[in-house]
């Protein structure tokens, strides 16, 4: 009976992953950028569902609040702030710059995979995984003590990106009106 229950769970996990893959491909291949952003929201929501499936409630709620609720809304806001041409066709020309960019991206991906495979992952925070009662408490303590500086630097980087996007959009709008 447990085997049957486990096989249902495995099927559900594979279906969620399939939905993530299909949604990610939709983000890439949609011609309309608003549809791509909505597809991204679907992918991020399915990732949160996968977190729930693996009993990571805090990560699932954080995924929904931060990525689906804030980042995706920010992306949609930026899309609507910057007036794009109403072109429905997308033509990709494979130029020398795109070849260099593709080579750099593939090289970076291979390097990251190599680093990930060679890294000896420590079990320093196994206490968080073993102690079910204080999971959120321990994450909060680590976030506000050991990882406070990276957390604040990421929030500062997001603020700078938002200010830069708004200033670029305003600069382009003032050029169009003149």
Curated annotation (Swiss-Prot):
Keywords: Chloroplast, Membrane, NAD, NADP, Plastid, Plastoquinone, Quinone, Thylakoid, Translocase, Transmembrane, Transmembrane helix, Transport. Pfam families: Oxidored_q3. GO terms for molecular function: NADH dehydrogenase (ubiquinone) activity; quinone binding. The chain crosses the membrane at residues 10-30, 33-53, 64-84, 100-120, 148-168. It is found in: Plastid, Chloroplast thylakoid membrane. GO terms for cellular component: chloroplast thylakoid membrane. Its EC number is 7.1.1.-. InterPro entries: NADH_UbQ/plastoQ_OxRdtase_su6, Nuo/plastoQ_OxRdtase_6_NuoJ. It catalyses: a plastoquinone + NADH + (n+1) H(+)(in) = a plastoquinol + NAD(+) + n H(+)(out); a plastoquinone + NADPH + (n+1) H(+)(in) = a plastoquinol + NADP(+) + n H(+)(out). It is a multi-pass membrane protein. NDH is composed of at least 16 different subunits, 5 of which are encoded in the nucleus. Belongs to the complex I subunit 6 family. NDH shuttles electrons from NAD(P)H:plastoquinone, via FMN and iron-sulfur (Fe-S) centers, to quinones in the photosynthetic chain and possibly in a chloroplast respiratory chain. The immediate electron acceptor for the enzyme in this species is believed to be plastoquinone. Couples the redox reaction to proton translocation, and thus conserves the redox energy in a proton gradient. This is NAD(P)H-quinone oxidoreductase subunit 6, chloroplastic. It comes from Chara vulgaris. The lineage of its organism: Eukaryota, Viridiplantae, Streptophyta, Charophyceae, Charales.
């Amino acid at each position: 009976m447990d085997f049957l229950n486990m096989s249902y769970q495995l099927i559900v996990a594979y279906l969620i992953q399939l939905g993530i893959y299909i949604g990610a491909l939709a983000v890439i291949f949609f011609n309309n950028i608003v549809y791509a952003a909505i597809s991204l929201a679907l992918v991020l929501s399915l990732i949160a569902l996968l977190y729930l499936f693996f009993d990571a409630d805090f990560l699932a709620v954080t995924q929904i609040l931060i990525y689906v609720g804030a980042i995706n809304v920010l992306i949609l806001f930026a899309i609507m702030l910057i007036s794009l041409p109403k072109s429905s066709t997308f033509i990709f020309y494979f130029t020398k710059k795109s070849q260099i960019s593709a080579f750099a991206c593939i090289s970076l991906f291979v390097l990251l995979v190599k680093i990930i495979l060679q890294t000896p992952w420590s079990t320093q925070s196994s206490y968080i995984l073993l102690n079910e009662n204080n999971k959120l408490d321990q994450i909060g303590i680590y976030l506000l003590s050991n990882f406070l500086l990276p957390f604040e630097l990421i929030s500062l980087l997001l603020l700078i990106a938002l200010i830069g996007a708004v200033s670029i959009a305003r600069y382009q709008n003032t050029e169009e009106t003149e």
